[in-house]
Amino acid sequence: MAEDETPTAGKIIAISDMHFGDETQLLNDRQLADRFTEVLSGRGPVEELVLLGDLLDLWVKTLVPAIREGRRFIEGIAGLDNVKKIVYVPGNHDHQVFMDAFREEVEARVMRGDLTTPKFMPARSYEGAIISGLARPGSDVSFSLVYPFITRLVAGREVVFTHGHHLDFYDPSFGWARTFWLSRRIIKKRRQRATLHDIEMANLPFCGAMSVAPWVPELVAEGLRFYSIINFFARLLRTKTMQQSVLRDTLIKENYDEIRGLLPLLGHPEPGCFVFGHTHRAGIGKIPETNITVANTGCWTRQEDEGVPSLTWVEVEHDVKLFRLTDTGAELMYSENI
């Protein structure tokens, strides 16, 4: 079904980039997963816990092994008494989760004799999610799957949540490295401005190919080798720390132009706040000459640069806050008004 509502929200907690299945994952550690779950249980009433993409790394492992790596954490959050809803917004590394749900929707229509094709964009919402099967019997938390973004009304202003991989389309220095180069040429001939559907169609072949690779383990190594080539040129063209994605490891201020380009396509050109992940660089900022606050959720993977924090999440209520998990609990890193 289509997702076009903007409900009033209480506290929202957003976390992303756990990458269950990848060798850099951290929350597969039972003690760390339990400690984070305990901290979340003490954050007061939570209207929604948003899993903002790359929960699973389906470019490295197939679905069941990846979920198995995250089972302890997923069971933990599903059992939180203070969380009302869990919303799963897939990213690029778990894009296949959305595609599976979309195909099931199409197949259900065909079984009813309905041969119409559901609208792919701007967003689709499904009750339940593949991970809801790990909820303990009797759990009151509800699960939903939404792709590629959700909006919520917080403190009277719109807040947009999305993983962030669509921002890669707007990177001026290295967008050609994937299918985006061809897409730009096609779009330029057909119309002056790309749509969200165009960007998704450009992203689809790449994500699809990478999600198939884990079924043939030898292909995973080839895919990672392809990325290493991209990274080499990215370091020459833009930054010394670029990894895994066009925007991976970029700072929030380096993403402002991409965010400006994407927001109108989401139908929310000037929200109060834009929350995303994808880059593995936690932070909070404000786009110059606007009232748009930007927050990045960071990641739960090992960082090559010890100076880059991980174990971070974002909380949105009356304002937006960035927290980090420490040995003593939740440490407030930054906050900004919406």
Annotated model-derived regions:
Residues E107-K119, Y147, A155-V160, H165-K188, ...:
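Conserved beta-sheet core of the metallophosphoesterase superfamily
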Residues M210-A234, K286-I338:
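Acidic, His/Gly-rich catalytic cores of divalent-metal-dependent hydrolytic chemistry
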Residues A2-I15, F20-L153:
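Core catalytic region of metal-dependent phosphoesterases/phosphodiesterases
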Residues D4-I12, L32-F36, F73, A177-R184, ...:
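A signal for specific C-terminal beta-sheet/loop modules enriched in small/flexible residues
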Residues G128-Y147, L236-P269:
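Alpha-helix-centered segments that form part of catalytic cores
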Residues E48-D54, K84-V89, P122-G128, K188, ...:
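Low-complexity, flexible helical/coil segments
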Residues E38, V83-K84, P90-N92, S228-I229, ...:
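N-terminal short leaders/motifs
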Residues V159-E258:
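Active-site-proximal loop/helix segment associated with metal-binding centers of metalloenzymes
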